Every structure is written in structure tokens, then in C-alpha cells.
């Protein structure tokens, strides 16, 4: 009976984008007088990608997965490194269109899961994570990602005489 009651109290919030859905399951924190429709204590999450196995775990796994995807996408944007590696997940760029994700289980005797996704699915996953992070219905988990914003090529003025001859018309 206890399992049934606690299961009834749990809330589920779904974040979706085209081929990907992120489901957050948990409870509101009544000690902080939070609303009943909020989730502050995340007990489980599920990442569902069309035609791929279900990916799920606890809140620590979710934080690591989000950090991995955000860091990897930042690498791609900055054209730095197209490989991310951690003890839980590896993501690497196979080619211009395909990314390989290796998920390592925290449980013993469970083989790693290798998934290949395209750019559109990667974008959908990132969109779901962005929806989750922006939501006021779910407690925001801590992220360790520091974004490196690419610097635009700046026009450097080294020789003032050269620039003057380019801008001004020739004087006769």
C-alpha cells in the first residue's frame, strides 16, 4: 500500500521536441510550501528518443547527462573539440551529420549502450534540456557547464595609412 500511495503523490512533467521527450518524475517539497504541481525532489527521469532505447536514471545522472550534452554542443559551436568523455557518457562526432553516444551504466555487469543520432535529434535533445532548465515547474539542478562564447573576427587596425588609402578617394 505504501508504494501505491507514494506513486499517487508523484508528479510527472513532460518536455517534448519533435523526436525527443524528457519526463521528470518526483515530488513537491511541502516543507518549503511549494505548489502541488511543482517537482522539487526528482526521483527519476526518462529520456525517450524515437527508435532508440529508453535512457533513464536518478537526479545525479540527469545532471551529468545535461552537462555532457551542453559541453559537447559548445565544443561543436566553437569548433574546438568534437569529443566529450566522462565516467558516465562519451559523445563524439562521427561525421558532419552523425554523433555517437556511449552511455556507461553505474550498475555493475551492465554493458555500455551505444546510440547514434543525427544533428536534428541532437538539437531536439538540447531543446528538451533547455525547456527543463527554463521551467518553473521543476527545481533547477546545478550545472557545471561554463559556456565559451566564440569571439568574432575583429578588424584590427595596424596601419593607419593603409586604412586611410582604402577609405578616402585618391587626391589629385
Predicted regions and their residues:
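C-terminal single-pass membrane-anchor helix
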Residues: 152-172
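Cytosolic/nucleoplasmic/matrix-facing N-terminal domains/tails
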Residues: 1-153
Amino acid at each position: 500500500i505504501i508504494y501505491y500511495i507514494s506513486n499517487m503523490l508523484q508528479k510527472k512533467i513532460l518536455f517534448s521536441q519533435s523526436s525527443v521527450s524528457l519526463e521528470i518524475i518526483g515530488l513537491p517539497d511541502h516543507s518549503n510550501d511549494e505548489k502541488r504541481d511543482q517537482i522539487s525532489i526528482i526521483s527519476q527521469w526518462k529520456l525517450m528518443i524515437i527508435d532508440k532505447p529508453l535512457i533513464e536514471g536518478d537526479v545525479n545522472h540527469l545532471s551529468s547527462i545535461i552537462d555532457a550534452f551542453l559541453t559537447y554542443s559548445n565544443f561543436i559551436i566553437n569548433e574546438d573539440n568534437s569529443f566529450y568523455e566522462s565516467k558516465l557518457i562519451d559523445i563524439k562526432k562521427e561525421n558532419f551529420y552523425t554523433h555517437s553516444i556511449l552511455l556507461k551504466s553505474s550498475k555493475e555487469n551492465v554493458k555500455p549502450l551505444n546510440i547514434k543520432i543525427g544533428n536534428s535529434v541532437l538539437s531536439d535533445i538540447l531543446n528538451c534540456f533547455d525547456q527543463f532548465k527554463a521551467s518553473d515547474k521543476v527545481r533547477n539542478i546545478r550545472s557545471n557547464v561554463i559556456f565559451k562564447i566564440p569571439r568574432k573576427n575583429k578588424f584590427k587596425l595596424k596601419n593607419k595609412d593603409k586604412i586611410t588609402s582604402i577609405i578616402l578617394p585618391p587626391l589629385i
